[in-house]
Structure formats: C-alpha cells, structure tokens
Amino acid sequence: MMADSKLVSLNNNLSGKIKDQGKVIKNYYGTMDIKKINDGLLDSKILGAFNTVIALLGSIIIIVMNIMIIQNYTRTTDNQALIKESLQSVQQQIKALTDKIGTEIGPKVSLIDTSSTITIPANIGLLGSKISQSTSSINENVNDKCKFTLPPLKIHECNISCPNPLPFREYRPISQGVSDLVGLPNQICLQKTTSTILKPRLISYTLPINTREGVCITDPLLAVDNGFFAYSHLEKIGSCTRGIAKQRIIGVGEVLDRGDKVPSMFMTNVWTPPNPSTIHHCSSTYHEDFYYTLCAVSHVGDPILNSTSWTESLSLIRLAVRPKSDSGDYNQKYIAITKVERGKYDKVMPYGPSGIKQGDTLYFPAVGFLPRTEFQYNDSNCPIIHCKYSKAENCRLSMGVNSKSHYILRSGLLKYNLSLGGDIILQFIEIADNRLTIGSPSKIYNSLGQPVFYQASYSWDTMIKLGDVDTVDPLRVQWRNNSVISRPGQSQCPRFNVCPEVCWEGTYNDAFLIDRLNWVSAGVYLNSNQTAENPVFAVFKDNEILYQVPLAEDDTNAQKTITDCFLLENVIWCISLVEIYDTGDSVIRPKLFAVKIPAQCSES
C-alpha cells in the first residue's frame, strides 16, 4: 500500500508542477518549450509536404524523361529502319549499276579496246597486204609483157600497145589455199645438218599482244585447223603469278598469205569474259566455221592447285570464224555446261590447247580428278627394273601434285556430240594404263590421216610423250620411245630422267608430226638442263635431232610452247607460240613464229 500511495502522490505532484509552470515540460533530455515543439511539428509537416511534392515532381520528371527516351528510341529505331531501307536501296542501285557496267559498258569498252588493238591494226595490215599483192602482180605482168625488169614501177616507159596484163593475184586466206597434213608426206630434208636452213619469221602485227611495261600475258592458247585458228591469253597487271587479272581474250580468225607466201594471222572475232580471273585452262576445237572453246570456271583459283575446294564448273564458248553483222548469237554464244558424265571421277575439266573433231563429235584434251583411295594401280607395273634407287610405289604416289594429295590426276578426253541437240552433255574418256603418269596438259590433233596425242611431261617421265592414237574412245596411244627431246627439271626429276620418282614439275612443249613414214616431228623445246630457258625450234626423229634454230638469245627464259603445222601451196609450214621473257621488264609474253620446213638440206 505504501508503495502505491507514493506512486499516486508522485503523479499528483507532477501534475501540479505542470499546471504551475504552464509552458515548460521536463524530460530525461532536458526542458522544452511547447510552442517551439508545435512550431517544429508544423515545420516538419511543411518540409514533409515539400519533400513529397519534390518527390512527386521528380517522379513525374523521370516518367516524362522515360517517355521521351522511349519516343526517341522509337524514332531512332524508325530512323534506323529508314536508313536500312535507304542503304538497301542504294546497294540495289549500286548492284544494278555494276551489272550494267559488266553487261553493257564493259563489253563496249572491250570492243573499243579490241578495235584499237586488234581490228584496226589488222585491217591496216590487210590493206597493206592487198596493196603489196597488187603491186607485186603488176610488176610480174609488166615484166612479163614488156620483157624487162622494173626496179620502180614506171608504166610510161613501157610500150602502151602491150596487151592487157593478166588479172592480179587476189588476196585470199590460207583456208582456200592450205590443207592439213594428209596422205603421203611432202618432200622435206631428212638429213642431219648444222646448216641454218630454218629461218623463223616473227608474227607480231595482227594478234592482240600487249607490249606495255608491267603487263604480263600468260596462259596462252593456240589451235590451228583447216586454215583457221583460235587464240587466247590472260593479261595481268604486275606479277605473272600474283598479278591482278585485267582481261582475258578468246579469239578466232584466219591464217593469211600477205602476198609473200608466208603464213600470217588475222583475228576476226574476239570474246572477252566479264570476270577474266575465273576462266582457266581453255581448250579449242574447230568444226564447220566455228571454234568451240571449253573452259573451267573457278572462283578459288587454279582448279589443279585447289582441287578439293573447286566445285566443278565448265563453260563453252562458240565463236564464228567468219562473223556476220546483226546475226544474234551466231557470232558469239556462251553456254554453261550442266551435264557431265564423269564415271568414277569426282571432277573433270579441259586441260590442253586443242582437240579434234570426228564427224559431229568434238574431243577436247582433259584431266579427271579421282580420289586417291579409289585409284587402283598395280605397283608391279612400275618400270624400275633399270633404276637402282627407285621404289615400286613411286609410280602410284606420283599421280598427284604431291604424295599426300586428296586426288590423283589422269589425262583423257572430254567428248561432246553436236548432233544430240538439247542440253550439252560432256563425257570423260580416260587414257589407257600403258606408260601412265600424272594427268597433265595434252593435245590431240590430226596429222597424215591419223590422230596423234601429246602429253606434257609433268612427272618423272621427262622424255617427250608423243604417239599415234589407236582408238579415241577408249583412248589408247602407241607412245614413241624418243631419246633426244626432254624438258628441263630439278629436284629428283632432272632432264632426261626415266626412273620413277615422286615429283611434280615440268613445262608444256608439244610437237607436231610432219612425216609418219620416218616419224619426223617439229616443235619447240627448251634446251636447258634445269631452268626453263633457251627455246629452240627443232625437226627431229625418235633418236636424233635433224636440224634446229634458236628462237631467242642464250639464257632467255621461256615456258609453254605450242606448235601446229600445215601445208601452204604444197610446202610444210609451222606456227609456234612461245611464252618468252625477253621484253626487259621481267614479265612473260607470247611470241608467234612462222617456220618453213625445208625440202632441201642446203640453204636456198
């Protein structure tokens, strides 16, 4: 009870004190004024309200800013879409312009370039030929009728009462005065002689050979048949191996007599592909006023060196040797090949300058790509009996560009039957196993009534591979055993090597059979042991060189050589194309030489 009384008393006393003091309150922390407390509470309410307003305004501002950001983002997205559409439109316009340049402007520029470098100079040369022929004919007739020789032509010194002269010799292309080598051979010198009876003549004024410094002209093609020819090359700016492809020319024309009874060449029709760097390894075959040129198309470089990544693509270009005006696709026709019968081979392509026709069927030299795992070869057939260090597997291992390559290469022919109509169908025919070496550039041509096959020596068999064709389909060749013509080489396959080794090197240097009874051939070989140099035109048998003449100074580098021979007024002539480095600017360019095969073994 005492405790409770005290507690009550204490409360009462406190109330009294508060009533007495009125405005003062005492707590643990000290004495405070109630008015001040109330004023503080009011200030706190105002501050809280102000903070609330500020917070609301801040939230509103943040919301507004977010809305603005979203709107700006939306506008940006819309702008990006508009920009994207604009860019797509610009890209489409650029593509359309590029296509127009490629399809319309490019060919016109090419036509102008062709006219300035080929047609106009050729026509000037042809006009000069006609004038030369006319003058020569007038001289002959005046000399004959007036019974004296005219140094310069002075008609007024001749008796005007002389009979009218005979009609002068008209210009005529060789296609009207030439024939292929058929039947019995014509008379030629068959004795070994050191006399300079061969006199090469340079052909340089009617083919589009660019002589500007720094321009490399490589990958040439030459085919001559029935007085007509096909020609091709690739122009590069800078290095021959790594230069930028500028232009590829594929042209056809006639072989001409300029009045001096020496064959010349006049180009009549030229085609330039819009993408020159994609055209590789072309081969041409003539048939009834047209040359058919078959090419490999590749966007990954040379199909031989990029065989695994190359997706087989072929094209055929048909060019009229006597083009007509306003004749649609008669003059020039480009055809993409869609059907190829390749048998066990994964891919095939043309590989060599020229082929032949038999009836309505064209045959192009070719090569097939066969997976190494599917290549069947009996090592016991490898000719190592006289080779001390060669291994039996070398023949099999050397069938690819290296011993571990995915594909082996095998030579053969691509067959195209013109009479079938409809879609073009090509069929690959592989070469028989006798004397089998890696597939390389080859050539099949008709001479003296029978096809002849040449295959470049790109492997251990370095002697020239040339022989009569027993059958075209299947392709069987009677190889000659030549012991005097071999290509230069290094490493394990040097010149005159006949022992199987694993190597891949060599040059294309074909030869043309001009006498089957004595098996005499003519062509350009490289007279060097290790380096591709010293081009020499030679007439040779299997076991001896009868006579020869150098086509350049000693140590002049050269590579590919192509030779075609024919009759001009019953005299055998050959035209040889030679890839040669003698221009002084370290780039290669082809030269063409006309060489008459002498009937007599003494100089005339």
UniProtKB/Swiss-Prot annotation:
It comes from the Viruses. One of its GO terms (molecular function) is host cell surface receptor binding. Residues 71-604 are virion surface. It is a single-pass type II membrane protein. Residues 1-49 are intravirion. InterPro entries: Hemagglutn-neuramid, Hemagglutn/HN, Sialidase_sf. The keyword Transport does not apply. It is found in: Virion membrane; Host cell membrane. Pfam families: HN. The chain crosses the membrane at residues 50-70. Glycans are attached at residues 72, 159, 306, 378, 417, 481, 529. Keywords: Glycoprotein, Hemagglutinin, Host cell membrane, Host membrane, Host-virus interaction, Membrane, Signal-anchor, Transmembrane, Transmembrane helix, Viral attachment to host cell, Viral envelope protein, Virion, Virus entry into host cell. GO terms for biological process: symbiont entry into host cell; virion attachment to host cell. One of its GO terms (cellular component) is virion membrane. Attaches the virus to sialic acid-containing cell receptors and thereby initiating infection. Binding of glycoprotein G to the receptor induces a conformational change that allows the F protein to trigger virion/cell membranes fusion. Belongs to the paramyxoviruses hemagglutinin-neuraminidase family. This is Glycoprotein G. It comes from Hendra virus (isolate Horse/Autralia/Hendra/1994). The gene is G.
